[in-house]
C-alpha cells in the first residue's frame, strides 16, 4: 500500500441522505421491536397511530430472558422466574455478547459475572447449557432470535396474521459486527429486518413526530445494559442527527452489580460465607437488588429480605437511596462524558438544546435526572414519553414510514457513530468516512503500491478514532490480487466505502488499470456467522418451535387425562353426585380403571400427546357407558364427567 504521498483523493465524497420513503417491495405488516439488554418491547403502526402491544401476561415490556429447564424452552417472564432456581440454565444480557469476540475485555468481565457458561467457539463467545442432559451450545444471535421470535408471536396474536418484517433498534454506538449480528438474529427468528434504526433516533421519532417548528433535542438513552446520547434537530418532519456517542457496556445492570458487590462483602464479613460460591444465591440477590433499585426511584429506603439465601442463612439488609447513589456515583457521572462529546462534535452550546429527552428505564433514577438537570444549568428534562416504550414506539413509526402509513413526509438523517478507514504503511489509520457522517454515504479514495512489482494489496478495514490502527477495531480484511508488474506508486487502486441505511459497511477495491475489483460487506470476518451457520440456526429455531408446540400439546393432553380421572373419581365417590346410585360392580370397574390410568400416568411421564389422548379414549370407553346408563336413571341429575360446561342446542 502506498504511503501518504502515494495516494490522492479521487472522485467524490457523496452524502446520500437517507429519505425514509415508502418501499413498495415490502409487503406489510412491519412491526417495530426494541430488542433490549434486559427487556424488549414491540409496537405496530395501525389506523394512524402506534400500538405498543401487551404480551400474554398483559405486560408491555418482556424480559429478554431464555431458559432451558427439563427439556422445555421458555422465553420472557416464565424464563426470568427460572433464573433463581436454575441459574446456569437461564440466559440473559446476551446483548452484551452479540457481535463481540471472546477475548474482548468486556466479555471477559461478563464471564465472571453471568451465571451461565460462556465458551470460546472459533473466537466467538457462545452460551453452553444442558438440554436433556446433553451440553448444547448457542450463539448469542440464536438467543436474541428467541427473544425476537417472542416479540413476533406477540404481534401476530394482536394482528391475527403472520408477521415476516420488522424494524429493529440497536444502540447508536453498536459497531458494524454488532449490527450485522442483530440482522442475523432476525433471520434466525424468521424475520426480515427491513431497517436497523439507532435507539436514540427512534426515541426522537416518538418524541417529535408532531413537532412543526425547529427544535434541537438531546436524547439521553440509559437502559439496562447500554447507553447512548444523540443530538438531533427536528424541523417539520425532518429528523437530522448531528452527533452521537455512547457506551455499549453501561446501564442498569452495572448499577445492580455495584450494589450486589457491596452486599456480598457485607455478608462475607458478617457470616464468613462468600455468596459468589453459590450461583443460586447470587441470582436471588440479583433479583431482589433490581427490585430494590426500582423502589428507590420513589422511596428513600427499602428493605431486602431473602430467606435461606445460602446454607440456612437469611439475608436482611436495608438499602437507602443515598447509599445506592454513593455506590454508583462514578458510573452516574461517567454518563456525562458522551454528553460533552456530542455537544462538542455538533458544535453546540448547552443553551442551544431546546429539549432533553430521557429514555430507558435507568433514567427513572432520581440522581440521574438531577445530574442531567445540573449539567444543563437547571433545565428540566422532558418526561413526556414513556422511557420503557419510546424506542419501540419510534421503531413502529419507522415501520409505518416504510409502508407509507400517512407518514410520507417524515425524513430521517442518521449518522455513522465511528470513523471508518483502512490501514496504510506504518500502521496508520487512513480515514475515509469520519464519525457523524450522514448515512447512507459513499466515499472513494485512490491508493497505490508500496513496493516495485507488488502483485497484490491487502485491504484492512478499521473503525475508531485513534491515529494508529492497532488502537482501533479491525472490522475485516480482503486481498486484491493480479496487479500487473509496475514500479511502486504507479498502480492506482481505488477503495470505495459505502455505508447503507442500516449503518452497515461495504468496501470495494478496484485496480483502475485492469478494471479488476473485489469487495466484501464488512461484518468482522471472525465475528459474524456464515450463511451456512445462519441456515442451520434457522432450522434449529424451527425445531425448537416444533418442540414447544409438541410440549404444549403434551401438557394439554396430560391435563385432560388427569382432569377426567379426578372428575370421574369425584362423580362415583361424591354423595351429591352418583355415589348412592351406582352399583358396586360398576363403581369398582370405574375406580379400578382410573387407578390403572393413574399408575400409567406415573409410569409414563415421557408419553407424548398421542399416547395420552389414546389413554384418555381407553378410559372413556370403559367409564362413559356406565355413567350414561346411570344418567338415564330417574334422579340422576349429574351430567357425565367432562360435559359440565358443554353448551348444546339439543334437548
From Swiss-Prot:
<dbReference type="GO" id="GO:0005789">
    <property type="term" value="C:endoplasmic reticulum membrane"/>
</dbReference>
<dbReference type="InterPro" id="IPR043129">
    <property type="entry name" value="ATPase_NBD"/>
</dbReference>
<feature type="compositionally biased region" description="Acidic residues">
    <location>
        <begin position="642"/>
        <end position="651"/>
    </location>
</feature>
<dbReference type="InterPro" id="IPR018181">
    <property type="entry name" value="Heat_shock_70_CS"/>
</dbReference>
<keyword id="KW-0256">Endoplasmic reticulum</keyword>
<dbReference type="GO" id="GO:0005524">
    <property type="term" value="F:ATP binding"/>
</dbReference>
<protein>
    <recommendedName>
        <fullName>Endoplasmic reticulum chaperone BIP</fullName>
        <ecNumber>3.6.4.10</ecNumber>
    </recommendedName>
</protein>
<keyword id="KW-0547">Nucleotide-binding</keyword>
<dbReference type="InterPro" id="IPR029048">
    <property type="entry name" value="HSP70_C_sf"/>
</dbReference>
<dbReference type="InterPro" id="IPR013126">
    <property type="entry name" value="Hsp_70_fam"/>
</dbReference>
<feature type="region of interest" description="Nucleotide-binding (NBD)">
    <location>
        <begin position="124"/>
        <end position="277"/>
    </location>
</feature>
<comment type="similarity">
    <text>Belongs to the heat shock protein 70 family.</text>
</comment>
<feature type="binding site">
    <location>
        <position position="95"/>
    </location>
    <ligand>
        <name>ATP</name>
    </ligand>
</feature>
<keyword id="KW-0732">Signal</keyword>
<keyword id="KW-0175">Coiled coil</keyword>
<keyword id="KW-0378">Hydrolase</keyword>
<dbReference type="GO" id="GO:0140662">
    <property type="term" value="F:ATP-dependent protein folding chaperone"/>
</dbReference>
<feature type="binding site">
    <location>
        <begin position="36"/>
        <end position="39"/>
    </location>
    <ligand>
        <name>ATP</name>
    </ligand>
</feature>
<dbReference type="InterPro" id="IPR042050">
    <property type="entry name" value="BIP_NBD"/>
</dbReference>
<comment type="subunit">
    <text>Interacts with PK4; the interaction is disrupted in response to stress.</text>
</comment>
<feature type="short sequence motif" description="Prevents secretion from ER">
    <location>
        <begin position="648"/>
        <end position="651"/>
    </location>
</feature>
<dbReference type="Pfam" id="PF00012">
    <property type="entry name" value="HSP70"/>
</dbReference>
<feature type="region of interest" description="Substrate-binding (SBD)">
    <location>
        <begin position="397"/>
        <end position="496"/>
    </location>
</feature>
<comment type="function">
    <text>Endoplasmic reticulum chaperone that plays a key role in protein folding and quality control in the endoplasmic reticulum lumen. Involved in the correct folding of proteins and degradation of misfolded proteins. Acts as a key repressor of the unfolded protein response (UPR).</text>
</comment>
<feature type="binding site">
    <location>
        <begin position="224"/>
        <end position="226"/>
    </location>
    <ligand>
        <name>ATP</name>
    </ligand>
</feature>
<keyword id="KW-0143">Chaperone</keyword>
<dbReference type="GO" id="GO:0016787">
    <property type="term" value="F:hydrolase activity"/>
</dbReference>
<dbReference type="InterPro" id="IPR029047">
    <property type="entry name" value="HSP70_peptide-bd_sf"/>
</dbReference>
<feature type="binding site">
    <location>
        <begin position="361"/>
        <end position="364"/>
    </location>
    <ligand>
        <name>ATP</name>
    </ligand>
</feature>
<feature type="binding site">
    <location>
        <begin position="290"/>
        <end position="297"/>
    </location>
    <ligand>
        <name>ATP</name>
    </ligand>
</feature>
<feature type="region of interest" description="Disordered">
    <location>
        <begin position="631"/>
        <end position="651"/>
    </location>
</feature>
<keyword id="KW-0067">ATP-binding</keyword>
<feature type="signal peptide">
    <location>
        <begin position="1"/>
        <end position="21"/>
    </location>
</feature>
<feature type="coiled-coil region">
    <location>
        <begin position="534"/>
        <end position="622"/>
    </location>
</feature>
Amino acid at each position: 500500500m502506498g504511503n501518504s504521498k502515494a495516494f490522492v483523493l479521487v472522485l467524490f465524497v457523496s452524502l446520500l441522505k437517507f429519505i425514509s420513503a415508502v418501499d413498495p417491495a415490502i409487503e406489510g405488516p412491519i412491526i417495530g421491536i426494541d430488542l433490549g439488554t434486559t427487556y424488549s418491547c414491540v409496537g405496530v403502526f395501525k389506523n394512524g397511530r402506534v400500538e405498543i402491544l401487551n404480551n400474554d401476561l398483559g405486560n408491555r415490556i418482556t424480559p429478554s430472558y431464555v431458559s432451558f429447564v427439563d427439556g422445555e424452552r421458555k422465553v420472557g417472564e416464565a424464563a426470568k422466574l427460572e433464573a433463581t432456581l436454575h441459574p446456569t440454565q437461564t440466559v440473559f444480557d446476551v446483548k452484551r455478547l452479540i457481535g463481540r469476540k471472546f477475548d474482548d475485555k468486556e466479555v471477559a468481565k461478563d464471564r465472571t459475572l453471568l451465571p451461565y457458561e460462556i465458551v470460546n467457539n472459533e473466537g466467538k463467545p457462545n452460551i453452553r447449557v444442558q438440554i436433556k442432559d446433553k451440553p448444547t451450545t448457542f450463539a448469542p444471535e440464536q438467543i436474541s432470535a428467541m427473544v425476537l421470535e417472542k416479540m413476533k408471536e406477540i404481534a401476530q396474536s394482536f394482528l391475527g396474521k403472520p408477521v415476516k418484517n420488522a424494524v429493529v433498534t440497536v444502540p447508536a454506538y453498536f459497531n458494524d459486527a454488532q449490527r450485522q449480528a442483530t440482522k442475523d438474529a432476525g433471520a434466525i427468528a424468521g424475520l426480515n429486518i427491513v431497517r436497523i434504526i439507532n435507539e436514540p433516533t427512534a426515541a426522537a421519532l416518538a418524541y417529535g413526530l408532531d413537532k412543526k417548528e425547529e427544535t434541537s433535542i438531546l436524547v439521553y438513552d440509559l437502559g439496562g445494559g447500554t447507553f447512548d446520547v444523540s443530538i438531533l434537530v427536528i424541523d417539520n418532519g425532518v429528523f437530522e442527527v448531528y452527533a452521537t456517542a455512547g457506551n455499549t457496556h453501561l446501564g442498569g445492570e452495572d448499577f445492580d452489580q455495584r450494589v450486589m458487590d457491596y452486599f456480598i462483602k457485607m455478608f462475607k464479613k458478617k457470616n464468613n460465607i462468600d455468596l459468589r460460591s453459590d450461583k443460586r444465591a447470587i441470582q436471588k440477590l440479583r433479583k431482589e437488588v433490581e427490585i430494590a433499585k426500582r423502589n428507590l426511584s420513589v422511596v428513600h429506603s427499602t428493605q431486602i429480605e431473602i430467606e435461606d439465601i445460602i446454607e440456612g442463612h437469611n439475608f436482611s439488609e436495608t438499602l437507602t437511596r443515598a447509599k445506592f447513589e454513593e455506590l454508583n456515583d462514578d458510573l452516574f457521572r461517567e454518563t456525562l462524558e458522551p454528553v460533552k462529546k456530542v455537544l462538542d462534535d455538533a458544535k453546540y452550546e448547552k443553551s442551544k438544546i431546546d429539549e432533553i429527552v430521557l429514555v430507558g428505564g435507568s433514567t427513572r433514577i432520581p440522581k440521574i435526572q438531577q445530574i442531567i438537570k445540573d449539567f444543563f444549568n437547571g433545565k428540566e428534562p422532558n418526561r413526556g414519553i414513556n422511557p420503557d416504550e419510546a424506542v419501540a414506539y419510534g421503531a413502529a413509526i419507522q415501520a409505518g414510514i416504510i409502508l407509507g402509513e400517512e407518514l410520507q413526509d417524515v425524513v430521517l438523517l442518521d449518522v455513522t457513530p465511528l470513523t471508518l478507514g483502512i490501514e496504510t504503511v506504518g500502521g496508520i489509520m487512513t480515514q475515509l468516512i469520519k464519525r457523524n457522517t450522514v448515512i447512507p454515504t459513499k466515499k472513494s479514495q485512490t491508493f497505490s503500491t508500496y513496493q516495485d512489482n507488488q502483485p497484490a494489496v491487502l485491504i484492512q478495514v478499521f473503525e475508531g478514532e485513534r491515529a494508529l490502527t492497532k488502537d482501533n477495531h479491525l472490522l475485516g480484511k480482503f486481498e486484491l490480487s493480479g496487479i500487473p508488474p509496475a514500479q511502486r506508486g504507479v498502480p492506482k487502486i481505488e477503495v470505495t466505502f459505502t455505508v447503507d441505511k442500516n449503518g452497515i459497511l461495504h468496501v470495494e477495491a478496484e485496480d483502475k488499470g485492469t478494471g479488476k475489483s473485489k469487495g466484501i460487506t464488512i461484518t468482522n470476518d471472525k465475528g459474524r456467522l456464515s450463511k451456512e451457520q445462519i441456515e442451520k440456526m434457522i432450522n434449529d429455531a424451527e425445531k425448537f418451535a416444533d418442540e414447544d408446540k409438541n410440549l404444549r400439546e403434551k401438557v394439554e393432553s396430560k391435563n385432560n387425562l388427569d382432569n377426567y380421572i379426578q372428575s370421574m373419581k369425584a362423580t362415583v365417590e361424591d354423595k351429591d353426585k352418583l355415589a348412592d346410585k351406582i352399583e358396586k360392580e360398576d363403581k369398582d370397574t370405574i375406580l379400578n380403571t382410573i387407578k390403572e390410568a393413574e399408575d400409567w400416568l406415573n409410569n409414563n411421564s415421557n408419553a407424548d400427546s398421542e399416547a395420552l389422548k389414546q389413554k384418555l379414549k381407553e378410559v372413556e370407553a370403559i367409564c362413559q357407558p356406565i355413567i350414561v346408563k346411570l344418567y338415564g336413571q330417574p334422579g340422576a341429575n349429574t351430567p357425565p364427567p367432562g360435559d359440565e360446561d358443554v353448551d348444546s342446542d339439543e334437548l
